[in-house]
UniProtKB/Swiss-Prot annotation:
The keyword Membrane applies. GO terms for cellular component: plasma membrane; proton-transporting ATP synthase complex. InterPro entries: ATP_synth_F1_ATPase_gsu (IPR035968), ATP_synth_F1_gsu (IPR000131), ATP_synth_F1_gsu_CS (IPR023632). The gene is atpG. Produces ATP from ADP in the presence of a proton gradient across the membrane. The gamma chain is believed to be important in regulating ATPase activity and the flow of protons through the CF(0) complex. It comes from Legionella pneumophila (strain Paris). It is a peripheral membrane protein. This is ATP synthase gamma chain.
Length: 288
């Protein structure tokens, strides 16, 4: 029965692993729901800030803030948002593939690229493949605040202010649904204009601003970009938890299939051992 005992030991070991992956799946599902709530809660605030920016920009039409001014693009900055931990399927590898494709496309058109990295996996990746890294941050946890990564954002905003970069983008995983997450590259600076902005350009209310519209615009535009980065980080965390939940569910299901296979092998081994014992008893009786 040595074979049967070994199989039973393997079944016990796999069953313990299955309990762990099942628990991790449930934890990831809970974290994903909480992150989705934070993601939804921040969007109305961001939309309202953008509306205010449009109103203020119209009120101070003679003043063109650098964040809203187009200029010749020679050097591009990109903020890459990744995870700190693994066990989330191909989430990071898909993001890295899209990031490298985007960077190479810019470089083929004669543009230099500066990079800021959020997340430990991104830091490890760019240490391996190289790149001009201006700043990085990791260990943000599952509930980050804007203050946690404001230093990295400020580095890129200062680079834009000083003319070191001429546009700023962010790449992160977009949450489509629980089963689908995809890499997404978004332009942050100069502030892109939507079709709706162009249509409503001549229709606006007149407001009196205190302090001056210029001072407000200088402050609120920076806050808006920080909020855009925050939304990208939170959405990436939601994607991480969704991918982790799916990966752990797959691991749990695979463990269940393995247990069934080993259980069948155990039953066969036990049956063979019993048959052998019966044959020995019958053989011994016949000898008597």
């Amino acid at each position: 029965m040595a074979g049967a005992k070994e199989i039973r030991s393997k079944i016990s070991s796999i069953n313990k692993t299955r309990k762990i992956t099942r628990a991790m799946e449930m934890v990831a599902a809970s974290k994903m729901r909480k992150t989705q709530e934070r993601m939804r809660a921040s969007k109305p605030y961001a939309n309202k800030i953008y509306e205010v920016i449009k109103h203020i920009a119209r009120a101070a039409s003679e003043y063109r803030h650098p964040f809203m001014s187009e200029r010749e693009i020679k050097r591009i900055g990109i903020i890459v948002v990744t995870t700190d931990r693994g066990l989330c399927g191909g989430l990071n590898s898909n993001l890295f593939r899209e990031t490298i494709r985007t960077i190479r496309n810019w470089q083929e058109h004669g543009k230099e690229v500066d990079i800021a990295v959020i997340g430990r996996k991104g830091q490890a990746f760019f240490r391996r493949v190289g790149g001009n890294i201006l700043g990085s941050i990791d260990h943000l946890g599952d509930t980050p605040s804007i203050n946690d990564f404001i230093g990295v954002v400020k580095i890129m905003l200062d680079a834009y202010y000083n003319g070191a970069i001429d546009s700023l983008h962010i790449v992160y995983n977009e949450f489509i649904n629980t089963m689908t997450q995809k890499p997404f590259v978004k332009q942050l600076l100069p502030l892109p204009k939507s079709e709706e902005d162009k249509k409503t350009l001549g229709h606006h209310w007149d407001y009196i601003y205190e302090p001056e519209a210029k001072e407000l615009l200088d402050e609120i535009l920076e806050r808006y970009i920080e909020l855009q980065v925050y939304q990208a980080v939170v959405e990436n965390i939601a994607c991480e938890q969704a991918a982790k939940m799916i990966a752990m569910k797959s691991a749990t299901d695979n463990a269940g299939d393995l247990i069934k296979e080993f259980q069948l092998a155990y039953n066969k081994a036990r049956q063979a051992a019993i048959t052998q014992e019966l044959a020995e008893i019958v053989g011994g009786a016949a000898a008597l």
